[in-house]
């Protein structure tokens, strides 16, 4: 949606890429027995270090301080939840079809790459912060590669918001139903102004 709103992708091309990405991710879920869980009340560092010690589990979403989602094999996630509870965290298994934003989406990445490379991507009217590295870009080659890379890499929402704030963004507007992102932004930095459309 950011690429479409900034004039980088046409609305039609944006919808087509969303559809291709969704189908590719759904197909990837059939190839592996993976899932996700939210981990609350532990630091990013503790979760990262613990995931390194658990087979087939990786951080998948850095939502806000004290809230990270992990992806992995079903067995790996079950084991991780036990370990994180022992460390004082709260674990919430998520009702999802697979281990998104992780290496479990490798086959989806291959499917999406061809479509992204064929898409007409123009220079956006403002820097686009993508999940892959949380840095704002206007370079179309970087935007393309990040669209592909973010399928198998964690969502760096906390880092994206912090980087936007460092670049003098003061107002955050959530587009679409719900207020989840507004809540996350406030948990990252209470000084932000948040609203929704």
Question: How should each PLM-predicted stretch be described?
Answer:
Residues 117-197:
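Acyltransferase/transacylase module recognition
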Residues 4-152:
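Alpha/beta catalytic cores of group-transfer enzymes, especially the acyltransferase/condensing modules
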Residues 1-6, 182:
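Short helix immediately C-terminal to the catalytic nucleophile in hydrolase catalytic domains
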